[in-house]
């Protein structure tokens, strides 16, 4: 099903665990193999460690992949924009509660039946949304939280506070189960939007009656620093991308004004016998010269920003960022007769790609 990242190796001994690097990129998920019900049951997670001291709540991170398009296709294609915007200091995201049949969540349930799915939420992140500080806390404090990536058209990052799990690019289908008391920090979103399904796993009546110990969660200061550095880097990339789009809008307006003034000057020259006001012509020409200077400056600044973004964006993410910039340029409001101006002045040929 995946692998488990142990966080308390002395207390919670497990066999053959994989470790996670501080900054990890996961390749495109491979096609999942079909397994029998019995095999699938054996591969399920176990969130309780049975020891001589009794049942102990595990402090581990469980990472796997899910066929989300098959299981949650309706949630991915849902166009209802009924999310609630949360826009606070250092935190911006959209969230709404959803009802998900338990059968669709079978792969994140434990094999011992100690936890059950309670509340489910969809979290949507648009370009520049995310957490620069803090985390999202949902669910029972003695339970677990499953974070499932349903859709990602941009570059999503995720950090489980206090652990070594800092992911710089979450792929569709990626699933991370962690202690609810840790929370989940979504790093600033770059480019297109992403949708995550958050599932709260609460202790069942059976586990509560049996009793269990809740150990103190561990902490990884190095990962915390790495997450903060990565978050700041992503904020810089977002700011530069926004600047590129802004420069493009300013260029269109400058080209448009230049075109209009040039036509007006041509009109004045064509009717020189009637329009003899030389001061007017001089003023128009000065304005045209100023605009051309501004255009040159904008083009130079654009080249600098593109070079800067290329140095910050991972090579694997270049196409994603390029597609987002192109889409935003096409969708942003432009000047009057925009298409005509852009085409006639070859503005569409300007290289805004990284």
Curated annotation (Swiss-Prot):
Induction: Expressed in the late phase of the viral replicative cycle. Coiled coil: none annotated. The keyword Ligase does not apply. InterPro entries: Poxvirus_F11. The keyword Cell inner membrane does not apply. It comes from the Viruses. Keywords: Late protein. Stimulates increases in peripheral microtubule dynamics and may increase the motility of the infected cells, contributing to cell-to-cell spread of the virus. Seems to inhibit the signaling via the GTPase RHOA and DIAPH1/mDia. Belongs to the orthopoxvirus OPG055 family. This is Protein OPG055. It comes from Monkeypox virus. The lineage of its organism: Viruses, Varidnaviria, Bamfordvirae, Nucleocytoviricota, Pokkesviricetes.
